[in-house]
């Protein structure tokens, strides 16, 4: 299990280990702060490469804050490996390839891809086990470690955090609520003519 964030994020890794993960890696450094999607993906890519070899990387589909669903695919692009998004389940694992089912909204697609690869999974793809109290009591914190900038292969701080981010968020705000609703009780051609008139008035047509 690997995540990126401040030291408080170590609690997330502990929870994952209580649920059955073998180990956890926290990629954390002051210079990682302020990272956009691109810089976050690059940082995680560096952290994964530091962690060792792999067959499949599993990522959540999207975060609950930025909600972009871009980090997983961008990690794969930085690593030069194939990736599948919105994965519902894994139907078969071969020696060098994996078969997955993806939710493409209007259809379900079955796809086979070479390993190593990266998959972003739907939240309902499985039912996570509950944290084990016994595992919590017996767990050694030796399975958790932190990786900082000086331990990555690319140690140029300009490639991380705010300096390495091609985009910056100016502000976050809820959409404006508008109350100028209009109920139209026409039907047929009268309704169609009225809608065309409104669209022309607003210069959509």
Residue ranges of predicted features:
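N-terminal glycine-rich FAD/FM-binding segment characteristic of electron-transfer flavoproteins
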Residues: 1-205
């Amino acid at each position: 299990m690997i995540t990126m964030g401040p030291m408080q994020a170590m609690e997330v890794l502990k929870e994952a280990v209580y649920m059955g993960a073998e180990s956890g890696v926290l990629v954390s450094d002051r210079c990682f702060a302020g990272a956009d999607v691109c810089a976050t993906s690059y940082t995680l890519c560096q952290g994964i490469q530091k962690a060792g070899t792999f067959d499949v990387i599993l990522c959540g589909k999207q975060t609950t804050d930025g909600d972009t669903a871009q980090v997983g695919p961008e990690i794969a692009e930085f690593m030069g490996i194939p990736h599948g998004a919105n994965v519902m389940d894994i139907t078969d694992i071969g020696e060098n390839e994996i078969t997955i089912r993806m939710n493409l909204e209007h259809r379900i697609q079955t796809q086979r891809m070479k390993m190593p690869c990266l998959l972003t999974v739907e939240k309902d793809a499985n039912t996570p086990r509950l944290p084990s109290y016994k595992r919590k009591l017996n767990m050694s914190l030796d399975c958790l470690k932190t990786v900082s900038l000086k331990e990555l292969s690319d140690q140029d701080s300009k490639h991380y955090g705010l300096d390495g981010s091609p985009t910056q968020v100016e502000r976050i705000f809820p959409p404006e609520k508008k109350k100028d609703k209009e109920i139209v009780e026409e039907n047929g051609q009268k309704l169609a003519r009225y809608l065309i008139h409104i669209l022309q008035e607003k210069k959509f047509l």
